Design a protein with these regions (language model features):
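Bacterial N-terminal signal peptides
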Residues: 22-33
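Short, conserved catalytic-motif segment at the N-terminal edge
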Residues: 42-107, 195-196
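Glycine-biased, low-complexity coil/linker segments
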Residues: 13-15
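Short, glycine/proline-biased beta-turn/loop segments that scaffold the active-site neighborhood
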Residues: 133-149, 239-241
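Active-site SXXK
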Residues: 55-61, 75, 81-83, 108-134, ...
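Short, surface-exposed loop or secondary-structure junction motifs
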Residues: 149-302
Length: 302
């Protein structure tokens, strides 16, 4: 990660929409507490909405809670820069003790991190001229293999193929097998697997949702910038948009700049747990996805 890669600026067409993406995510992903404090509260009718129709959303959430599909939720409806509806439902925690949901609860973004962090980071690099969407992946990761057909045909996998899930990479990786082979966590070992694993179809011929696409994009971002995706996203997305309660791990930063992973995180008590484990423990502030948690140490984009 020591070396940064610089390229000539891409075409204007490739850079279009980056600011739109950032603006969109700033609207969607700021903490609800911050939004509630900064936006004026109005009746739904004042922004052209129907209070009675909003009750359908209420009913849907209560129904999901009653059917035990979810323990709780937070709903915010914003239109024309005004808060028309904000409500917490059900419980944030149900085991080992019950805690009610609050409007400032922090949720696990899960796979939304693909678009919220990784895709935006890629487009920032496109806008800066450090990356092109039509570049082949192997330009940045030399060990990354192209697709090869049975008749000897070859086709490169491009950045855009990773972003649109048309690369041919398999959906997931064998976590237990890789943990036994490489140890845990081992992002380098995982990337070694992704670089050489069987491509399941010719790029651009099929759509297949794959966590491995975005893990590969993460490594490209880190290769270009010389930073971890966590640090790059914090400096270039989260801090800029005022997303002070958004991070890959609930941590605090020390005066020397180092990050310390700790349950003493100032906003730890606001985090909603995600999953009960076989041993009875409950994951809270840790990603529940095994690939991200076991092989990537929690800093992953899948």
């Amino acid at each position: 990660m020591e070396n940064k890669i610089n390229f000539s600026p891409p075409s204007t067409r490739e850079g279009k929409g980056v600011r739109f993406l950032l603006t969109t995510f700033s609207i969607l992903l700021c903490s609800l507490q911050a939004v509630a404090q900064s936006l004026p509260r109005v009746a739904p009718e004042q922004v052209g909405m129907d209070s009675h129709r909003l009750l359908h959303a209420d009913e849907a959430i209560h129904r999901a809670i009653d059917h035990k599909e979810i323990p709780g939720a937070v709903l915010a409806v914003i239109r024309h820069g005004k808060m028309a509806y904000l409500k917490a439902y059900g419980n944030k925690r149900i085991y080992p003790n019950v805690e009610p949901m609050e409007i400032n609860t922090v949720f696990d973004m899960a796979s939304c991190s693909k678009s919220m962090s990784t895709a935006v980071s890629v487009m920032i690099l496109v806008e800066r001229g450090q990356l092109r969407l039509l570049d082949r992946v192997s330009f940045y990761l030399p060990d990354f293999q192209e697709w090869r057909g049975e008749n000897g045909e070859k086709k490169d996998i491009r950045i855009i193929d990773l972003m649109t899930h048309t690369s041919g990479l398999p959906p997931y990786a064998p976590v237990s097998e890789l943990q036994e082979k490489y140890g845990s966590p081992n992002p380098k070992g995982l990337m070694e697997y992704i670089s050489t694993c069987k491509r399941e179809f010719k790029p651009q011929t099929k759509f297949q949702y794959s966590c491995l696409n975005y893990i590969t994009l993460q490594h490209i971002i880190e290769t270009i910038t010389g930073q971890s995706l966590r640090d790059f996203a914090k400096e270039n997305i989260f801090d800029i948009l005022g997303m002070q309660y958004t991070d890959y791990l609930p941590t605090i930063q020390q005066q020397d700049g180092k990050w310390i992973n700790t349950v003493a995180c100032p906003w730890m008590d606001r985090i909603a747990p995600t999953e009960k484990q076989k041993d009875g423990s409950v994951l809270c502030g840790q990603v529940h996805d095994p690939l991200a948690r076991i092989l990537k140490g929690g800093i992953s984009v899948n």
